[in-house]
Amino acid sequence: MKIVFMGTPDFAVPCLKALVENGHEIPAVFTQPDRPKGRGYKMIPPSVKKCAEEYSIPVFQPLSLRKGEDAEKSMTALREISPELIIVVAYGQILPKEVLELPKYGCINIHASLLPEYRGAAPIQRCILDGK
């Protein structure tokens, strides 16, 4: 199956690896742009980008999928790829309706906790703090 993967942190890497290792065609990975980190503000690529590069999968890093030149380029690429499915794991952006309607079989979002109760940047920690 032709699957576009969208994810960013370490949490998303096992899902990407499982898709590749189980023979799915992954024509593209979308992830957040590299960000400066540490004292020297060295640009660090997201974990998903590093994983995709290990498998020689093309990587897209748009600032936004909703507006601007990045969004237009990303939509053009997605239309050309024509994915059967998009899998989203901790991507860090809300997908516009146009992206959600593009794949033949739709989109699947994998989240680290119950939604909508534990949405946001620290869902696992919030579950633990609530004793769940």
Tell me what each language-model feature is:
Residues 1-132:
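One-carbon transfer enzymes
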